[in-house]
């Protein structure tokens, strides 16, 4: 979870510097790392070739299957993770930049997502 929290902090700094694509990338990875930590903490993650966190699509699918559909996390958290991935695709692979408002919203949502994953799956671990 520490990696997710660091990425969240980086996203906020990049946003304040006006780097909307960089902020969007870091916010997405904050959520990716938090989702992966939640899967591992829940016993649904694996290390190695079966690790759902090896790819974005694998992680999103595993998160939806094992945590959202089981009711361990809300559907809203699943939607946020999917939206973050969509915005990162624009930030990293499209000629146009992410809109400033979308980047702001994503950074805010990443902070909420990481906090929710920590509270639900790693409440006793120290925050970074």
Task: Please name every model-derived segment.
Residues 1-128:
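Terminal alpha-helical segments
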């Amino acid at each position: 979870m520490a990696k997710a929290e660091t990425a969240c902090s980086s996203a906020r700094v990049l946003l304040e510097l006006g780097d909307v694509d960089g902020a969007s990338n870091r916010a997405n990875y904050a959520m990716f790392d938090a989702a992966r930590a939640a899967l591992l903490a829940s016993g649904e993650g694996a290390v190695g070739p079966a690790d759902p966190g090896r790819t974005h699509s694998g992680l999103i699918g595993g998160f939806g299957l094992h945590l959202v559909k089981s009711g361990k996390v809300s559907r809203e958290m699943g939607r946020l993770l999917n939206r973050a991935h969509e915005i990162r695709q624009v930030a990293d692979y499209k000629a146009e930049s992410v809109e400033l408002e979308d980047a702001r919203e994503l950074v805010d949502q990443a902070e909420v997502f990481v906090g929710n994953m920590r509270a639900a799956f790693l409440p006793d671990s120290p925050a970074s």
